[in-house]
Amino acid sequence: AGVGLDVFDGEMLENFFVKEIQPYASIGKQADYIPALAKINPDQFGMCIHTIQNKTFMHGEATTGFSIQSISKVFSLAMCLSLEGDNLWKRVGKEPSGTAFNSLVQLEVEKGIPRNPFINAGAIVMTDILLNHLKHPEEEYLRFVRSISGNNQIHYNEEVALSERENGYLNAAITNLLKYYHNIDNDIERVLHFYFLQCSIEMSCYDLSKAFLPFANHKQAFTFEGITPEPPRFSAAPRRCR
């Protein structure tokens, strides 16, 4: 997480965040509907915090990589806002869904306009928007994530992406329904391929914490074309990516 607490220190991390959160680490289970995720060790626990004062605190397996799945939707939204501005909201809403993140029923009732960018339907529409704008979307998306996190070793996990493609029937249904309501411009298989790659991108807690610093330090706005590893240097109108 990117935080702005002047008094934050390693002792606070250990005594508050770790003690409060670690007991919940054994609750729940992996997403077994994606075979490649079902076999991940569930006993790993890591935490990393970067402050906007350039302090870093880590605990446990903070540098262990994992596929970020729906966290990728934040990066997609930042890119789409940079490219589309307020026009984005003509295709995706801003409201809580009130239903499951992968609901087909709500999407049908609302004629193919997803409630928000963070449910699967909204993320799939954003994927379509990126395909419309970017000449080399997979490469440009990865370049953005590498740039904002300052780690050029970040990569797509092809095994996870393939596992999702082979078992992503509900996401395929969502994409077909979006296409039916004319809210998808590109080929369905092309959209799904890129969407599953985004979800598969592999980062660590350290990488993610670093990547979200520009969002925490929102006085310095940015676009996907203007990121450097050093937080003070961003370029864009502030309203774009807040």
Where in this protein do the model-derived segments appear?
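Active-site-adjacent helix/loop patches that line small-molecule binding or acyl-intermediate pockets
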Residues: 2-28, 80-198
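A short, well-structured edge-of-sheet supersecondary motif
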Residues: 21-59
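Active-site SXXK
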Residues: 54, 67-86, 211
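A short acidic/small-residue loop/turn micro-motif
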Residues: 63-65
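Active-site-proximal alpha-helical segments within enzyme catalytic domains
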Residues: 74, 78, 202-220
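Generic alpha-helical structural context detector
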Residues: 128, 176, 210-213, 239
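A penicillin-recognizing enzyme superfamily signal
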Residues: 201, 221-242
